[in-house]
Amino acid sequence: MSDALGWVFTTPVSPGDTIDWLPTVNSRNPPHNEDFSWGEVSYSDIVPCFARGTHILTPGGDVLVENLRVGSRVETLDHGPQTVRWIGSAKRSARGACAPVRIRAGALENDRDLWVSQQHRMVLRGAKAELMFGEHEVFVPAKSLVNDCSVRIIEGGAVEYFHILFDNHEIIYAEGAMAESLHLGKQSFDALSYASRQEIKMLFPELDRAGTQLPQTARQVLRNYEVQALLHAV
């Protein structure tokens, strides 16, 4: 029998909610995962989001993320202009796992400071990535880039997060940096509120079918220890 780990909620879970939980693992041994830890789980630590005020590149130029609408066209790295299928947002206290990551201008080829949720995956690219992981471009969670200098977690006040969904998982341009759109992986999809899941299922009815394969990520996703190895490679 294979190991299994998951969560079952008896009430809807919304962005910013936290859950204190005790683990039950179907195994004599704990999960071997560098990123795994017992304790508090937060929606915003699973679902990738852009903070209000983020400029997103469209065919007509930069548009604030809060001004995008279903039907808006957004530039993507792989497939050119793509249509926004769904947008979600939520206001939360900027503390703990809900506190945003601030990426200073220039740190990731971004023209201005970029604010994203901690698990939002950014693109790192170059010869080192290709040598170490076989791909010129890879995804890394924003929080794995934190260096207490150009990339920091900023606590205090409130933050409004937005997530953008396309037909496929895409790489888009946020403040000039390459970042992911919302990926309908099992964890991120299950972490959305019930109402949001129902809206998305209306757009993608195949998600209700048993055995449906969820879409792959647009690039390989690195674990934290892999990100650190890449960042410190000589």
What are these regions (language model features)?
Residues 1-51, 57-59, 63, 159-234:
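Sequence-level preference for short, compositionally simple segments enriched
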Residues 51-58, 75-196:
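Long beta-strand-rich cores associated with HINT superfamily self-processing modules
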Residues 63-65, 82:
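Short, isolated positions in well-ordered beta-strands
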Residues 66-73:
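Structural motif
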